[in-house]
Every structure is written in C-alpha cells, then in structure tokens.
Amino acid sequence: MAQPTSGLYSTFGFFICLLFFPASWEAGANTFQELQKTGEPPKFDHLLPLTQGLTHRASSDQKTSRQHPPDLPEATATQKAKNQCNTTRLVKPVHTPLDNAKAADYGNTTVRHEMPPASEKDLSSQGKHLMARNERSADDPRSTTSENGSDGKRLTSAPRRNTSCMPSTRRTSLTTKSGMRASPMGASASLRTTSQKPTTFHVSELIRQSSSPVYATETPRTSYNTLKTLTTSGPEHHTIPFASDKSVQITTEHIKEATSASEITRTQSTFTKYEGKTSPASESSSQAQVLPIKHHTTSASENTIPVSAKSTPSTEKATKPTASPTVFQRKTIVATKTVRATRTSERTPVFLETTQPAKATEDKSSTVPSHVHKTETMHQGTVGSLTSRTNLGLSTSEAHYPQQSTHSLPGGLHAAGETGENNSFPVWAIVIVILMAVIILLVFIGLILLVSCASRARHVLTQNSEEPEPQPEDKGSRNSYPVYLMEQQNLNLNQIPSPP
C-alpha cells in the first residue's frame, strides 16, 4: 500500500508542478510585454521580483502623466527612478486641482502634488549642486546616466536618505512625465551597476536621481510658461479669427460708411459748388444746350422733307401701273360671268369675244409693260390645256373663247388657273387609283394562270380515259413479261450454254 500512495503523491505533485509552470510562464510573459511597452529592456537577474512594483508604477505614472501637457520635456533621471524604486506605495500624493489662472501663472497642469516636509528639506539641501547637472540632463540623456552613476558611487554611505527616497521618487514620477521618453540605455546601465553594489548604493543613487528632477521641474517651468502661452494661444487663435473677422467686417462697414459718407459729402460739396456759381452761368449753359438742338432738329426736318417729297412721286408712279391691272381684273370678272352664261346661248359669247379683247389690247398698248406679255405667253399653254380638260362637253366656240380671254387679260389667266387647280384630283386619290389598277391586273393574271392549269389537267384526264385497258397477262400472271425476263437473266448468269 505504501508504494501506491507514494506513486499517487508523486503524480499529484507532478501535476501541481505542471499547473504552476504555465502560470509562472504567463506571468513572466506579461511582465516582459509590459516592459516592452514601457520601452525598457527585459532583465532576468535579481530585478525580477520587482516587476510587479514596476508595472504598477508604470500604470500609475501613465495615468498621472496624462494630466500633464505633452510639450514638457522629460528628464531621464525620473525614468530611472520610476523603474527602480518599489517601495513608493507607502506615500500617496494628494491631488488638488488648481484654478485656471493659477495654472497659467505657474505653467503647470491642474494637478498639484503635495509632499511631506521631510523630503523637501532633504531635497533642498542638494539643490545647488544639481542645477548644472539637470541642465546637462535636458540636453544629453547619456551624460545624465554617466553622471548619476558616478555620483551614486560617491554617495554610497547615505543611510539617512533612505527615508526620503520614497516621496521624492513619487514626486518625480508624478510631475516630470510627458510625451518624451528617456533613453533606456541609461536605465539599463544604472541597474547593472546597482546589481554589483549593495542596496545602500542603490537607494543613494535613487535619492540622487530623484532629487535632481525637483529642480528639473522648476527649470522647465519657465520654458513651460512659454509653452503654456503657446498652447493657450491655440484657443485664443481660434477665438481671435472670429473677433478679427468681426473687426474686419466692422472696419469694412466703417470703410463703406466712410466712403458713402465721403461720397455724400463730395456730392454735397459739388452741389454746393454748383449752387455757389452764379445763375447766369447756368442760364448760359442751358441756352448753349438748347441752341444746337434746335439747329440740329431743323436741319434734320429739312433734309427729311425732300426725301419724303421724292418718295411720294415714286409711289405715285408705282401705283399708276397697279391701278390699271385692277381695271383689268374687274373686266375679267365680267368676262367670266359671261362665259358661264354662254353655255346656254352661243350668240352672246361671239359678241363679247369681239368687243372685250379689243379693249384689253388697247389698255395693254398703253400701260402694261413688256414682261407682262411674256408671262401671259408662258401661261397660255397651261391654262388652255386645263380648260380643255375640264370643258370637254362645251362647244367649239366656248373652247375657243377662254383662249382669247387668256391672251387678252392677265387676270383671266389667274382665274382660269384657279379653276383648273380646283378641278384637278389630289395626289392621294391618284395613288389610290394606281394601286387599284395594279391589284386588278394581278387578279386578272392569276385568273388566267388558273384557267390554263385547269385546262391542262383536264386534257391529261381525257388522254388517260381514252387509252385501252391492259390485258390479263400484263396484270401480273405467271406467264407475265417481267417473270420471263427474270428467268432469262438467271439463266444467263448461272448457266452458260455449251456448244452442241
């Protein structure tokens, strides 16, 4: 029984070790990742038990550093002190918000960190020696690490300053945090030197490093005031353009008002100047303006009057030849009336033919120009053809009379043309007639083809009926002709007759 129990204990212990190993591995990985986030190289020597304190310090310092402006430069010594001291949890700073006016005066953020008086006394004793060293640390981080290391070696015997390490480092970690990161090389070098030295040397170096940022925060205060003014100028810059726009608008309005006022005053002054002039001058100017207008108007009227006088005789001349065609139109109207009346009697149109064309010829010789004769001769054939088409049922005298009237009068030409156009068919009617004629022709051609085909078929039927009926041998009996031929073919192919 002892062997199984020992085996169970060993297996149980082995399982516990297996469970503890991943937990420790995860804890180490978390600390390594947090060290990488803070920008510090991992260290796996005697500083490993301090990782939890370092992580808590880094998180608390990051929370407090968010309250500080990003433009404030960070001292490298505060970065080292923040990474090395693990007993700073004992002292907690008191955050008291300041007013905006005080923050603008002191150049700090709205968080003030109160410290115990003991640490301030210890730090004030070292202030004079650390001013020059802090100025160097602001310029070169490597020089700060080397100086801090050398000073730490000198201040090894400082057991009394062990008490002031905690609050001083806490103050530096809270007040001197900004967007700038210190180089991790100095921190690593200081930690390597402390690993070879006792803890008193480590504490004294931390005191030395933590006491320096007190004045580093005071020295950037002057620079931070300038930066504060620059940062405060940002919202002022945002508000100033609005004020400047207003001022610009106001000034432009004032300028416009001033210009309008100046224009008004100028116009008023001009009016006063004109009013200050004597009245006879204004009268003379008005007279000088009136006189040329009178002269110009009279000359224009005189010039236009003869133009109108010249134009009137031309219009009279133009109206004279137009008056004569009106007379012809009246006469032609009478002639057309008589033509319609001549359909009943044949004697009256003969009398009108001899009288009215004579009058028309006399008028032509007197008034109508030569181009009218040409136009009449051009329209003779067309009008005569139209009248001949429309008046097919008239007598020879009636058909001859419109031709003489067209020879005589141009008005008669227009009247006859109008009558011919009215009697003519429209285009769509002509198209329809042509289409109907084509369709009728096609129908006739189709009928002719059908008749011819029917006659041929009938002829074939008659020929078939006239042929004699076939004999019974031809209908397919045993002695029919095709069977005989088949027998002969078989004999010729299979049996060749031999000679006798």
Swiss-Prot record:
The residue spans the entry assigns to the Cytoplasmic side of the membrane are as follows 451-500
Q: Where, in residue ranges, is this chain on the Extracellular side?
A: 28-429
Compartments it resides in: Cell membrane; Cytoplasm
Q: Which UniProt keywords apply?
A: Cell membrane, Cytoplasm, Glycoprotein, Membrane, Signal, Transmembrane, Transmembrane helix
User: Annotated region Disordered: where?
Assistant: 55-198, 275-324
GO CC annotations on file: cytoplasm; plasma membrane
| Annotated signal peptide | 1-27
Q: Which domain of life is it from?
A: Eukaryota
The residue ranges flagged as biased composition, category Polar residues, are 76-89, 159-178, 279-289, 298-324
Q: Which residues cross the membrane?
A: 430-450
Membrane-topology descriptor = Single-pass type I membrane protein
Q: Does the keyword Signal apply?
A: yes
Is this entry keyworded Nucleotide-binding? no
Using the UniProt annotation, give the residues that carry a glycan (glycosylation sites): N108, N148
What this protein is reported to do is described as: May modulate NF-kappaB signaling and play a role in cell growth.
Query: What is the name listed in the Swiss-Prot or TrEMBL entry for this protein?
Result: Mucin-like protein 3
Q: Which organism is it from?
A: Mus musculus
What lineage is this protein's organism placed in? Eukaryota, Metazoa, Chordata, Craniata, Vertebrata
Which gene name belongs to this protein? Mucl3
